[in-house]
């Protein structure tokens, strides 16, 4: 990050967009904290950021369609700004068919990871900055719960507190056990 910032003569910027539940909002605070720790500066305008991250939701099909729509718009921005990085994470990335669709039809995306390995985010960013290929790191599940990640709180008066991760009831109508 430091080398690229020196080349550009300014700090690298990022913008995180959160789709979905309170756990995604909490995860986005962690993503923000990690990015700031490695030298990025938050940018309010998505189109101006060097790194755009979508923290996705997949509970409803409409949420998936929103992400695809936003990616179409972001592709046009990236064509004008080829050094821009695009990262996707969250529940939607835990679905194998979504990742296959992204690999095939959205090859301009730079980084894809799921809900179980946010603690590796800085490492994944470094891997992408060192290579010129799409980085995909999806874990089906994990027994690792890393709680001491840097976090940048969006509100001074409230905070998300994870009391559980996902659910293991596997109700026939629910996707949560498969993606969280």
Q: Predicted segments — roles?
A:
Residues 1-180:
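Proteins enriched for Cys/Gly/acidic motifs involved in redox and nucleic-acid/cofactor modification
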